[in-house]
Design a protein with these regions (language model features):
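Acidic pyrophosphate-coordinating catalytic loop
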Residues: 28-33, 127-137
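The catalytic Nudix box helix
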Residues: 88-123, 140, 156, 165
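Acidic, metal-coordinating catalytic segment for phosphate/diphosphate chemistry
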Residues: 21-62, 68, 77
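Nudix hydrolase/Nudix homology domain
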Residues: 1-21, 85, 122, 130-134, ...
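A conserved beta-turn-beta hairpin within the catalytic core of GNAT-like acetyltransferases
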Residues: 81-87
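Short, well-ordered beta-strand micro-motif
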Residues: 39-41, 65, 141-143, 165
Length: 195
């Protein structure tokens, strides 16, 4: 047996603070509904002073919702940034007073699809773009999802819910037909976790 005290998990740990940047000031450069652009004045480890801009947004929840029959509730949503309708999982930003992400996942599922879940379980939490944003996405698997009410969309959402077979969704992800990264990550992680 190796006498080294470093374990496999230790080798994956965050690097030591000698790589850290010191934030000397921070401010919002631009604000819009949903996110801000923040600018930090920073001092790099070698002493260089510069600024760093990034997207500053609230945590988000992403839901992989299964019906009692094992189908998945997905949404078709217009995405202005890419100029097309996008198929994906229900998702949305949290509210400032949200301290229960599972409850936020239930709320987003109901608002975007009109479905309620019998059970909601955490799947994974990720930082999807931590080089340019402070985003944190909390993924949940929802089971026993059934329509219960009308959608309650935000003013800037164009969403049509539908259901697809899970195997069809997985095939579409693997074939590159689903380009929404949140959906790709959710389906692939669900598969890797052996759910």
């Amino acid at each position: 047996m190796n006498d080294d005290s470093e374990t496999a998990d230790d080798s994956l740990a965050a690097p030591t603070d000698d790589l850290a940047w010191e934030t000397t000031d921070t401010r919002i450069d631009y604000s819009c509904p949903g996110f801000d652009i923040r600018m930090d004045d920073v001092r790099l480890p070698d002493g260089t002073e510069t600024d760093f801009h990034y997207v500053d947004e609230p945590a988000a929840v992403v839901v992989l919702p299964f019906t009692p029959d094992g189908d998945v509730v997905v949404i078709d949503e217009w995405r202005q940034a890419v100029g097309r309708t996008n198929r994906g999982l229900p998702a949305g930003g949290t509210e400032p007073d949200d301290d229960d992400y599972a409850a936020a996942a239930r709320r987003e599922l109901a608002e975007e699809t009109g479905h309620e879940a019998e059970a909601v379980e955490p799947l994974v939490t990720v930082e999807p773009a931590n080089g340019i944003a402070n985003s944190v996405h909390h993924y949940f698997v929802a089971r026993g999802c059934e329509p219960s009410a009308d959608q309650n969309l935000d003013f800037n959402e164009s969403i049509r819910p539908t259901t697809v077979g899970y195997d069809d969704l997985k095939r579409a992800v693997l074939a590159g037909e689903v380009r929404d990264a949140r959906t790709v990550l959710g389906v692939l992680y669900y598969e890797l976790a052996g759910e």
